[in-house]
Curated annotation (Swiss-Prot):
Keywords: Ribonucleoprotein, Ribosomal protein, RNA-binding, rRNA-binding. Belongs to the universal ribosomal protein uL14 family. This is Large ribosomal subunit protein uL14. GO terms for biological process: translation. It comes from Wolbachia sp. subsp. Brugia malayi (strain TRS). GO terms for molecular function: large ribosomal subunit rRNA binding; structural constituent of ribosome. Gene3D superfamilies: Ribosomal protein L14. Part of the 50S ribosomal subunit. Forms a cluster with proteins L3 and L19. In the 70S ribosome, L14 and L19 interact and together make contacts with the 16S rRNA in bridges B5 and B8. The lineage of its organism: Bacteria, Pseudomonadati, Pseudomonadota, Alphaproteobacteria, Rickettsiales. CDD domains: Ribosomal_uL14. GO terms for cellular component: cytosolic large ribosomal subunit. Binds to 23S rRNA. Forms part of two intersubunit bridges in the 70S ribosome. The gene is rplN.
Amino acid sequence: MIQKNTLLEVADNSGAREVLCIGLLGGRKSASIGDTIVVSTKSVNPKGKVEKGKVYRAVVVRVKNCIRKSDNSVIRFSSNAVVLVNNQGEPLGTRVFGPVKKLPSGSFMKIMSLAVEVL
């Protein structure tokens, strides 16, 4: 579960390395896979598309918390990770690194198509 002030890794090549969750969209207290959150960049690559300290939207693609699938198997990732998106929901980067859990019902299809592995 992701809440305010959670440090997250960035799983794309937009230029950000680490972001801080500063808000959750939809009036929730915690976010899970597929939810959109508001983040602030904390560390960036010098030649990236994003700037340090700027505010962006992001989609959660991996969480450390256990996720139960419909066949009662459990998936658990080693890190909390997000993909930065613009206001229309399109990813800022052109590649997504690491495995990605299947996002809910057709939303963010572009992120799933860019991912190396979809679970």
